[in-house]
Amino acid sequence: MVKQTINFLSNTFPKIYSSLYLKYLKQYSEIHNIKKTELKALVFLKGNEKINMTELCSKLNIEKGSLTSLIDNLSKKGYVCRKKTIKDRREYIIVLTEQGNEIAIDFIEKLSTNLEKKFKKLNKKDRNNYLVAIKVLEKLSDI
């Protein structure tokens, strides 16, 4: 089981991630003149409001210096803003602006349409197996 898991993580998972997400992320970012990492951040922020820089670094798996530059760029473009927290005035949370929210929603809607087309090519049994596999992987990630 361990050997298959390592093979899955090193070979199969990157293919799945690329096929279902990264290829479309790249296409969308090129068309809309936004960097892939910026778009990933907007989509992540859409689903995780009120997150601080430290948490965002961890979730996006990037260094704090890189994240600071990323947030600076998104802020200049009008996609995010920094807000001081009530608990600690030295700490900021990153919040989507209306424009950033619109981009995230547009990307998610277009990605959803793209994924629906792919999933329609699977038979019902394979779609159900796919959903079960996702649930098992989510459980495993929480252990």
Where do the model's predicted regions map?
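C-terminal regulatory/oligomerization modules of transcriptional regulators
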Residues: 1-4, 23, 125-143
